[in-house]
Amino acid sequence: MKTNLTAQVSIDFRAPKARVWKALTDPTDIRQYFFGTNLVTEWIVGGPIRFVGEWEGKSYEDKGTVLKFDPQKMLQYDYWSSLSGKEDKQENYRMITYRMTEKDGITNVQIFQDGETEEAREHSEQSWKMVLEGIRNLVEK
């Protein structure tokens, strides 16, 4: 079974790059579209990142490390999910990368999630599409 596949989604927003970047990095904004999760991080490269919340009645705490933080261009972190059923060790962490571009008032965001099986990739792409639509509802108001 392949586990080196990459989930990839992309969306255009009719919103300024600065507003979309805020939606991707501000804990208050994130809580509104990311299934109610509480983000805990200072966005320092090498620093921790945590997503804490409840999913379908079960508490979770996903954690990882901020790998890249280039404001309004790129954001990257790895993470492990307590809901994954996998042991908390580096080989079970996934890498998430956000890339942003803007042209003529349209901001494009691409999200990549590495290290997926075929089934997990499809699930991840569907989840990220829901997240991006939630961001759209927030930034295009």
Specify the residue positions occupied by each region the protein language model found.
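Short amphipathic
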Residues: L5-F13
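A conserved amphipathic terminal alpha-helix motif
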Residues: G115-K141
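Extracellular beta-rich ligand/substrate-recognition surface
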Residues: M1-N4, V52
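Conserved catalytic core of Hanks-type protein kinase domains
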Residues: A23-L24, F69
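Short hydrophobic/aromatic-rich beta-strand segments that constitute the beta-sheet cores
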Residues: I49-F51, M74-D78, V109-I111
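Hydrophobic-ligand binding "helix-grip"
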Residues: L39-E42, K58-D104, D114
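Short beta-edge strand/loop motif at the mouth of beta-sheet-based domains
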Residues: Q8-V9, T28-E61, Q72
